[in-house]
Amino acid sequence: MLSMIIRKSRPHLSDVSINQYLSSLRTLNGGQPINDLNFLNDFDGVMMALSKKKPTTVKNYANAAIVALTSVAADPALVKKYSDVRDALNTQYSEFHATHEKTPKQEANWVEFGVYRSMVDGLREEVAGVLKEKEWSVQTRRKYQEYLLPLIFTVLPLRNEFVMTVVSKSAFNRLTPAEKEKGNYFVAPQKGPMFLVINQYKTSKRYGEKIIELDDPELVASLKVWLKHRPPGTTSLFFEPVGMVEPATTSGSITKVMTAVSKRELGGKSIGSSLLRHIFLSAKYADTLKEMEADAEVMGHSVETAQKIYVKN
């Protein structure tokens, strides 16, 4: 099985990364199960199939091909072709983002953080009337989820790590270390603050387990309401919007909800977690970055040098 081969070849990769690579490879294989990697031998055909994709997407597909091919010790010349594509796009990506300019797609969908936050406030007002209802319909649950997800991302701009299992503190404590490593958990103690335990994310091998205590008053209050009204007998934090019963098991499920809400509420703007991270950090640090760049020019060094050498705690 390819996943096992990749994991043996690259033990540092997280399950999230391996699953993303496998998903990309299935797409390159026309959506068919992967029995071998012969479809990657047609390099020109693969590049033609990706010709209309944005550069970051092409880079991700090329990287998936590299990981798979090197795991089975494929022809080095073929690996180099994909590596050259990835490296060129990495350089292009780095040079572009060094300018701090928005991509055309980001520009088309960008809103200021205050505008997005106002959207969340409006969604909160829309669900205010259901807070005292004892029984929630599917439509009510869907509407509340469409408020809660954007709210969470304005407070905690993670990637898409909110595919989570809800557990009590005692149930979490009974999990083995191996069980904890395999998932992301929303821990809701009877007493004390709620917190997130995140092990499955893109850079988990580098940064390890993340434990995030929830202390934002609006978010905590809204989550308490949600925990009371989620579909009974379920352990997922969020759900597929159709039916509101099936757990949201992929980051794509979260993205669909986020972009659907922003398109409806913000005049067609498509804002998922990735773009919202840019918007959030730009609002928080853009002026600071401009000041650092100006000071660095006067002082004759780079911003990176200023951060690493001159700025002290």
Where are the regions that the model predicts?
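A short, glycine-centered helix-capping/turn motif at helix boundaries
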Residues: 72, 142-146, 152-180, 287-290, ...
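C-terminal catalytic core of tyrosine-transesterase DNA break-rejoin enzymes
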Residues: 275-302
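Short, basic interhelical loop/turn and adjoining N-cap
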Residues: 13, 172, 301-307
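Conserved tyrosine-mediated DNA breakage-rejoining catalytic core shared by Y-recombinases
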Residues: 165-217
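Basic, Lys/Arg- and aromatic-enriched nucleic-acid-binding interface segment
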Residues: 118-160
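Non-catalytic DNA-binding core/recognition domains of DNA-processing enzymes
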Residues: 6-92, 254, 274-278
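Active-site/catalytic core of tyrosine-dependent DNA strand-transfer enzymes
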Residues: 205, 209-269, 274-275, 280
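Flexible interdomain linker/hinge and immediately adjacent N-terminus
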Residues: 78-134
